[in-house]
């Protein structure tokens, strides 16, 4: 085996262990070593997309080779269509703004676990990536933290790049957009800013809720949105809540956001949580028994991020104690986390506690009766559902017998006003909150 073959085998083996199977198959395996001489390792890649990905791995490649040979090398990435080393290619014209925030190549549709809680969002995102600028434009994905919004957004970009590596995509957070806009005003480069954000095939903006109260930024984004939409360019947005619930967001911007397809992601159901854990375990090459997967999924019912965090905690605990992963070990590893998640407040729990407190049935809370002894507890339950959970107004309305989100908003406003002058109501709310959060 030559030195080049030996080094390449070490690099491949390292990434086969550290990257998911999908990433390895699609982005690592297609690379080919060309030669290794004078401290330079030339690696041939099939597309610019692959080269962008490997450039993010440079530090890891250098470390792997150093551990193997004691040499500090420099990787050069070349395209199969143009074997000239990257270092010798003419430099691109420098721009004040980044073309995009680097995408995570592991955020693909193949690695996203689909379930009832995200089925509509998944289908809409995939359709938008296959036919950008068409029926699903703009695409707005909203929901709580750690439920997969960013994963789906980047999966759209990765799929578009897979089909067309030269596609112009800009993926930013709303804060990135605002900072770039402010800097363009300070530096007098607004026209360049507009070219950067409008001469695109797709614009993806994460966390649009941070546009709230930013008047000039909202105006600039409104104009950018219109240019892209009129030119049939794909727009994808994410938010932690329904835009209609975001305070200090202009009506015309909310209207634009709701033009296309707004889809909500909610907390995953039990079977989806198990599938997520199983997929993560396979990706990390962990041997996790089914009873452990079920144990974790039943007790961590909030979001994907916490599920995966729990699994990694079990892994560290297993390695630290040099013991295989068992139900007993998992219980010990998650002792603190499980205690916290078992008290998660849900709409159903709120309805039950409020019904018990006011000596009525839960079916009265979700029903249509309009007598005062039922209407007030129902409004209190809606108010607490908004305050103690991450659910949107439409979701809350659905859980209260299919009420419209405006009915929920009215109930919340009424309780907020009444609690200012009703000491008894204040006391009731304090007792209910303490009971729910105990």
From Swiss-Prot:
Gene3D superfamilies: 1.10.1750.10, 1.10.8.60, 3.30.300.180, P-loop containing nucleotide triphosphate hydrolases (3.40.50.300). InterPro entries: AAA+_ATPase, Chromosome_initiator_DnaA, Chromosome_initiator_DnaA-like, Chromosome_initiator_DnaA_CS, DnaA_C, DnaA_dom, DnaA_N_dom, DnaA_N_sf. The keyword Chaperone does not apply. It holds the Pfam family Bac_DnaA_C. Residues 319-438 are annotated as: Domain IV, binds dsDNA. It is found in: Cytoplasm. One of its GO terms (cellular component) is plasma membrane. CDD domains: AAA, Bac_DnaA_C. Keywords: ATP-binding, Cytoplasm, DNA replication, DNA-binding, Lipid-binding, Nucleotide-binding. Residues 102-318 are annotated as: Domain III, AAA+ region. ATP binds at residues 146, 148-150. Domain I is involved in oligomerization and binding regulators, domain II is flexibile and of varying length in different bacteria, domain III forms the AAA+ region, while domain IV binds dsDNA. Belongs to the DnaA family. Plays an essential role in the initiation and regulation of chromosomal replication. ATP-DnaA binds to the origin of replication (oriC) to initiate formation of the DNA replication initiation complex once per cell cycle. Binds the DnaA box (a 9 base pair repeat at the origin) and separates the double-stranded (ds)DNA. Forms a right-handed helical filament on oriC DNA; dsDNA binds to the exterior of the filament while single-stranded (ss)DNA is stabiized in the filament's interior. This is Chromosomal replication initiator protein DnaA. It comes from Limosilactobacillus fermentum (strain NBRC 3956 / LMG 18251) (Lactobacillus fermentum). The gene is dnaA.
